[in-house]
Amino acid sequence: MLNRILTLGALCLIVLSCTPTDSGASGAPNDNTTKMEPDYSNIDEETLDYLGITDPEHLSAASKRALAWPEGSRSNRWFIEYKTFDLKGDFAYEEGVVRRDPSAVIKVGDTYYTWYSRSTGPSQGFGGDIATEKVFPWDRCDIWYATSKDGWTWKEEGLAVARGEKGTFDDRSVFTVECLPHDGKYYLTYQTVGGRYEVRVKNQVGMAWSENPDGPWTKLDEPILSPADNGVWKGTAQDRFAVEKKGDFDSHKVHDPCLMAYNDKFYLYYKGEQMGEEITFGGRQIRHGVAIADNPLGPYVKSKYNPISNSGHEICVWHHDGGIAALVTTDGPEKNTIQWAPDGINFEIKSYVPGAPHAIGLLRENDDSDDPLKIMEWGLTHKYVSYDYQIIRRFEGARKERHRAKGVKTE
C-alpha cells in the first residue's frame, strides 16, 4: 500500500511539474486568462442617478450587477402584479366536482371559449384501489368546455374530448388541455394516461381537432409526443426515484402541452419530468422542452437544444416582438420569472414576478402585442379549494407604476 501511495505521489509531482502555470513570478495571472473588468469610467450621469450610484469609483458587487443589466431590463416593462377573483355561473364551486387547468381563452365572435380538465369524486393517492379509484384530481378526467360573454359568468357546455376506449393510450385520463386556433381549425393538445395509473406510468401528449369550437372533435389515433426512452429503472418496485440511469429531462413524463404557430412551423412546448427526479434549488427538477413540426398534426421532432428551460411548471407562452415569451413558475432556480427568446428556444430572464397564478389560461386575442404583458390583463387560473377539489378562477394583471402609502391622494 505504501509503495502505491509513493508511486501516485511521484506521478502527481511529475504532472504538476510538466503543467504550465497561469502565473508569472509575481503570482499575477497570465494575460491569456485574466478576466477583464468592465470599464466603468464612462458611465453617464443619468444611469448613475437612476441606479442610485453616487461614487462610480467605489462600486459594490451589487452595483456592478445593476450596471450590467440590459438597458431594457431596467424599466418596469416586464414586471407585473396579479389579483385573482371567483367566477360566476358554472365555474362557481360545486361540491364533488374538479375543474382545473383551463386552456387559453379563445374569442370567437362575441363569445369566449375555454377548455379544461373535469372529473368527479375524491382522490385516494397510490394507497387506494388504483383499478377503481382516482389517484390524483387530474386522474379519470375528460376535457370539457365552457363559454362566456363577459369573462365573468361561464356556462359549462359539456364534453369536448373523452377518454379513449379500453386498451388505447388515453383510456385512463385526458387532461391539461390547450387550444390553438389556426387557419379556420381548432387544435386541442392534452396530456394522456393509459392503463393503470402506477407511480412509474409514462404520460404522453394527444391531439384532437375540429372546424368548430363546439366540436365535434376528431382525435388522433396515436400520441403526438412521448417521453424519451433512454432512462433505466432500477428494480421492479413502483419507485420513481430508483433508477440505474435517469435519461433525458423528459424520460418519465411529457406534460402541459401548448401548441404555437411560429416561424411558419408549429412549436409544441411542454413540461418534462425525468426518471429519478430530484429536489434541486428547493423545488422539483422540472424543465421545459419544445418539439417542432411543419404541420399541426405532426410529426413532431424534439429540438436538439432541449431542455430550453432549467425551471418551471405549467407551460405559459405567448408571441412577442418576433419571439416567444414565457412565464416560468413554481420549480427550479429561475422560478417566478418572465423570460423571452428571440428564436423561441434560447430564453433569457426579463423580470422576476413572485405570486403569479398557476395553470394560467391566457387571453389569446391580446397575443403578440407591442406591450409584452398586455396578454396578462386578464385570463383564467385554478385554485385548490382542497386537495381533492379545484375551481377555475379569473386573474387580472397590471404593472405597478407607483408605491403609495395609504391615504395618499393622487391627481
Predicted feature descriptions by range:
Residues 2-8:
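Sec-dependent signal peptide recognition
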Residues 11-12:
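Short, linear, compositionally biased motifs with a strong N-terminal bias
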Residues 16-17:
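C-terminal motif of bacterial Sec signal peptides marking the signal peptidase cleavage site
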Residues 20:
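Short, conserved catalytic or interaction motifs in soluble domains
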Residues 24-411:
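Carbohydrate-active catalytic/glycan-binding domains of CAZyme proteins
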